[in-house]
Amino acid sequence: MTYKGYLIDLDGTIYKGKDRIPAGEAFVHELQKRDIPYLFVTNNTTRTPESVQEMLANQFNIDTPVSTIYTATLATIDYMNDLGLEKTVYVIGEAGLKEAIQAAGYVEDKENPAYVVVGLDWQVDYEKFATATLAIHKGAYFIGTNPDLNIPTERGLLPGAGSLITLLEAATRVKPVYIGKPNAIIMDKAVEHLGLERQEIVMVGDNYLTDIRAGIDNGIPSLLVTTGFTKPEEVADLPIAPTHVLSSLTEWNFDEN
C-alpha cells in the first residue's frame, strides 16, 4: 500500500546533533512536493515548537509550519490538562520545557507541587534531584517526558532524559508515567493530529527503542533508518522486525510504499 501520512523523528533521522543529514532534508522536501501530510514527533523537550521550526529552517534548510511539530513537551501538557490536577509543578528541564508548561498556566512550586516533570536538563545538579525527590515522596504525580537513556550527538551518545528520570525512580521507588515515544500517550495524540487510520501511517526514525517501538507497540507500520542510534549490524538481532529498514532515506520509494 501507499502510506497517506508520515510521523517522523528528528534527531538522528533528519539531522544528527548539529550535523546535516542531506537524505533527511530531501525526504521532507519530497513529502512537501507531493503534499503528503506529515508530523515531526520528537522526544526533545529542550526547545519549543517555534524554536524547532526556526532551527529546521536556519540550520537544515527545512521550512515547515509550526503545526507540523509535536514535541514531548506538548504531549506532556496535554496529558497534565487531561488529568486536571492543581496547576502547580516542579520541572527539571531546559527553558523550552519550563516556558511551555508555564505558558499553559502552570505555576512553579518547589515544596508541594501537584506534578514533578522531568526532561533533559543540561545543568541538572544534586539540589534539583533532591527537590524533586522530596516532592514525589509527598505525593506529587511523577511524569517523565521521554525514556531516552541516550541522545545521539556529533560528540557521540550522551545521557538523555531517561537517565535522569531513572535516577529519580531509584531515589523515590516511584515509577514515572512516561509521555514520549514509544508510549501510547504521545502516539495517540500524533495519530489524532494526522487524522488518518494507523495502517495508513508510517513511523520513521533511527532509534529502535523509541521510534520503531512507538510504531510496533501502537499498531503503526515503521521505517527504521540506520543513520543514528540503531546501527546496521544490530538489525538482525532486533526482537520484532521493523516494517521497513533502510540505510538512507534516499532509498525510500514513495510510489511503492
Per-range role (PLM):
Residues 2-8, 15-33, 47-50, 54-70, ...:
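Asp-based, Mg2+/Mn2+-dependent phosphohydrolase catalytic module
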Residues 44:
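Conserved phosphate/oxyanion-binding catalytic-loop motifs
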